[in-house]
């Protein structure tokens, strides 16, 4: 908390905080907690420092030395031997720090919650003055906290000190030391110092007391031998082996001896087996044992404490303030500002003032600042309603200090503290317990009940309208002679007197707090309550009083008011009445004579005589009497006797017994009926269950059944070819699947569990199979089957191009903006599908995204994925290794995984793509990632990304999971960007980039080296169901832009090809495929033998994720060959004839059925079968043809008409700058065949209508309506991945790299 500048103009404030001398040899003084705050007057700053610490040996708190000039005498600091808090030396200009006798810094409080010793910025920027030597030659122990020495321009020798010998726990995270070698004027240590010293002479050598000790020593030592070990209670070294030879104590100092605990109040006597009072008991006060606690502390058991706990109340016994358990409800004690529940609060404000309702005691401080009274817009805190300040009218004690720097302008006094009796000063603010500063509207203080300020000084200044302050005798409030007063720059006393603002004439010379007889510190004559009066009502008045010294006390209510001139009472209580109002029982006046009193052997009854005095009845009277004899006893009217005869008592007793038995019977019957009814309910419920009368499930969850199919493969159908990877739990092979009874060969990845793994690994293996078999989406890998051999085998489709991380790294010079954004959309759609299926992936990263083709990626690696139940919203992991750098903060701290935590991983994955395979947080140890994220650091903006793309990443990395976007929103956002890619990603030469042939991939080449793949068939191609054969239709090209559209000067944005959905209709034969129904193909072959033809093109032509294109002349059906040619068409680009020949462009440049116009050629690219790329005869293939990478500028040659050329994104440069727009001269298509592409049903699979694109819900439709068979991939297991880290490895102590991932100071 910083004070205003005006506060620090102290004048002659001399602070003496010395409070107690625990022993004859050591004096204790209070520390400060000002940090870098200082007085505006440097002279006063020095004088305050000197008064604080002169002749002080133990600083109970922090030692802060700041803003001291170079010519000041600091020799008074030599007396300090111990500091319980931290030592701060900053912003000074002196040359030498004379803390020569300081031996131990306990570090009970740390500077910036980290350092016990902080020394920095001790030099003058425009001069040659500054700290040169640390005179800490006897400092040998820092019990808690680290050392920070930095930016001391002239400081020497600090880098030679062996700080690890001084610091008890020298963790790298709290040790910071900047080298001072090379500073001007620095010399070397004396030769006897062995290179470690505080100064240049032999008297400045560092004394090592820990690192030089024998191994048998469990603490410090005074020599290298076993016999030189210090006592285990010693701290900072010793001069001998005894507990009285310690330089400082580890725990407590009991009259010079270091002990584990102070002598207790009670000790056990083994002879009497009893706890007996210990006459040598002492109280613990800090690190000392004292016979008496300081006057402003409270005794709790055997300790000196600042405040009693909530279950106890503060009482005073024999002049000692003690904490005693409350007999009933404790008086309400509330936490003050800066303590307990208000630890982080800086001022009383509208957000916390209600916590002070009905409080009688404040354990801590009350602080009123401008941000509390007038509000804090920055923190959205409203101004305080002045009426709410009345909650402090119940406060009687403040154990800390009262600091008022701002007050409501419409309040002219502090009357809300009218019941405040004591300001304890157990915590001081720069030595102050009462501070009132710059309150221009205050005219009087009105602390009318204040009787004591136990400790600390008073500072009241710059209150221009304040009066009455000069009349107060402040010393009557002080408990010690060392307390001081600074009161100045308030309203002049003569001006107050001139306006009549003076004390009431009934006030004594001690002064007053304000106008009126109720504001006096003491009364000149008499007082009634808080009001001073001239005389008591002894002989007249509405109510009568008696004098108790100078206090008028009202007579007891049983005293009869006497006539004027006569005393009604002469003391307190009903026994001092002159005459009773009602009756007199012995010496006391009572309202009536007592009916019954407990005597020694019987009850006693009394009656009143004619003088209204009470007397006892005759002993035979058992129910009262009217006189002294037995005949005056009270009789029962029906017997005529004073007591009831025996025969009259019998019926009453009998009636009572009968009534009691009747009640018992009723209760027993009621209980029996209750038990019977409960038993009948149970039987009926069981009968209904056995008779199947239940119409609803016992535990309805609302979750749909998982109807995914699991294919069981025989071991004879699988052939292993090559090991692709292995780990702790299994091995991944490249293999071939030959379905039983078929002639096709399908390349697959086979994941085999090791034989040495246990049952738990088998269960986890099958859990992964469950997840993979449950997904069915174009951008998610799906399980092909499971082989239940002795070692379980998972079979997935083999991905020809490896993982996306390696792919972008290998081809980073040839990847354009369109392709990057397409990948972002595909990954988002895949994750959106997982979210709809309540699957949490937990391990999304670029390494876990596979490349089926350059334009089609799939998410894989479900080894960490978990399926949430119907009522679950999050998954709690129990252990294992985790990819920390890809995980959200809640996953790292609490191991809670949700779909929103997958969004965080998605943002990191996109960052990897945009940096072409960059490593997130490269160079930073994984265990330090949580701290960096909590401090607000995130991955930097990739160079190619505009702010639009980067802001999407940043939204994915919000700390609040609910603030992150949904995958649905991410897919919509990146779809929008993909329609205009060069606006959002800036890549040099983007429009000229040509993605290399898929066959050029290193991963792909490695797969082809060891097996003849001519007869291979892609797994998805094999899994497409064969319903019937359809004649191969003749396809036509689609017109993208007509000439009329170009004439109006509107150029449509580049289009993004959507990745889901397909719908096209054949007009031949009446066969049609609708959405969600895969289209079978008829096998065809070329009639020109010279033309190389790509075989086995997949059905991905109708998958929305395809972006490659092929163009080929129509061919005729061929005879049946093997099972693969019987199942599919070799050319998937053969489309149905047009359905509607009339079409025109919509606003986005897409076709809508309208009318015929001349059109340019538009191609929807499709994928090639990645495994059919070479022929045995060595003919030139389409993918090996140089023409693959560029388009011809003229008409195609006749011999090239049948060449299959994939069209990759960003490989054509035309006027539109879009890979999907091709020049007229590129390909020639017969005019009669151009209308097929105008069929709206054909284009429905490519892109939804514009109205749908502009609505984010279109992603729901296009991501969940269609289901496809998926492939597999290969990855190293988690145990071998360096990006995964066990939660037990997250420990502090790792080096931080340079910025931007660390703070300014380095760690050593």
UniProtKB/Swiss-Prot annotation:
- Annotated motif Nuclear localization signal, positions: 676-684
User: What superkingdom heads the lineage?
Assistant: Eukaryota
Question: What are the BP-aspect GO terms?
Answer: cardiac muscle tissue regeneration; cell fate commitment; cell migration; cell surface receptor protein tyrosine kinase signaling pathway; cell surface receptor signaling pathway; cell surface receptor signaling pathway via JAK-STAT; cellular response to acetylcholine; cellular response to epidermal growth factor stimulus
Which residues does the entry assign to the active site, renumbered to this chain?
A: 843
Q: Where is this motif: PDZ-binding?
A: 1306-1308
Stored Pfam families: Furin-like, GF_recep_IV, PK_Tyr_Ser-Thr, Recep_L_domain, TM_ErbB1
| Segments on the Extracellular side according to the record's topology features | 26-651
Q: Give GO MF terms, alphabetically.
A: ATP binding; epidermal growth factor receptor activity; epidermal growth factor receptor binding; GABA receptor binding; neuregulin receptor activity; protein homodimerization activity; protein tyrosine kinase activity; transcription cis-regulatory region binding
List, alphabetically, the Gene3D superfamilies matched: 6.10.250.880, Hormone Receptor, Insulin-like Growth Factor Receptor 1, Chain A, domain 2, Phosphorylase Kinase, domain 1, Receptor L-domain, Transferase(Phosphotransferase) domain 1
Q: What is its EC number?
A: 2.7.10.1
Protein topology in the membrane: Single-pass type I membrane protein
Q: Which cysteines are joined by disulfide bonds?
A: 29-56, 156-186, 189-197, 193-205, 213-221, 217-229, 230-238, 234-246, 249-258, 262-289, 293-304, 308-323, 326-330, 503-512, 507-520, 523-532, 536-552, 555-569, 559-577, 580-589, 593-614, 617-625, 621-633
- Those parts of the protein on the Cytoplasmic side are 676-1308
- Residues modified by glycosylation: 138, 174, 253, 358, 410, 473, 495, 548, 576, 620
Cleavable signal peptide: 1-25
Keywords (alphabetical) are: Activator, Apoptosis, ATP-binding, Cell membrane, Developmental protein, Disulfide bond, Glycoprotein, Kinase, Lactation, Membrane, Mitochondrion, Nucleotide-binding, Nucleus, Phosphoprotein, Receptor, Repeat, Signal, Transcription, Transcription regulation, Transferase, Transmembrane, Transmembrane helix, Tyrosine-protein kinase, Ubl conjugation
Q: Which InterPro entries does the entry link to?
A: Furin-like_Cys-rich_dom, Furin_repeat, GF_recep_IV, Growth_fac_rcpt_cys_sf, Kinase-like_dom_sf, Prot_kinase_dom, Protein_kinase_ATP_BS, Rcpt_L-dom
Question: Where is the motif (PPxy motif 1)?
Answer: 1032-1035
| Subcellular localization, as worded in the UniProt entry | Cell membrane
PTM text: Isoform JM-A CYT-2 and isoform JM-A CYT-1 are processed by ADAM17. Proteolytic processing in response to ligand or 12-O-tetradecanoylphorbol-13-acetate stimulation results in the production of 120 kDa soluble receptor forms and intermediate membrane-anchored 80 kDa fragments, which are further processed by a presenilin-dependent gamma-secretase to release the respective cytoplasmic intracellular domain E4ICD (either E4ICD1/s80Cyt1 or E4ICD2/s80Cyt2).
**Catalysed reaction, written as an equation:** L-tyrosyl-[protein] + ATP = O-phospho-L-tyrosyl-[protein] + ADP + H(+)
**What stretch of residues is annotated with the motif PPxY motif 2?**
1298-1301
Known function: Tyrosine-protein kinase that plays an essential role as cell surface receptor for neuregulins and EGF family members and regulates development of the heart, the central nervous system and the mammary gland, gene transcription, cell proliferation, differentiation, migration and apoptosis. Required for normal cardiac muscle differentiation during embryonic development, and for postnatal cardiomyocyte proliferation. Required for normal development of the embryonic central nervous system, especially for normal neural crest cell migration and normal axon guidance.
Instruction: Report the family membership.
Output: Belongs to the protein kinase superfamily. Tyr protein kinase family. EGF receptor subfamily.
From the Swiss-Prot or TrEMBL record, give the protein name: Receptor tyrosine-protein kinase erbB-4
Q: Which organism is it from?
A: Rattus norvegicus
Q: Which gene encodes it?
A: Erbb4
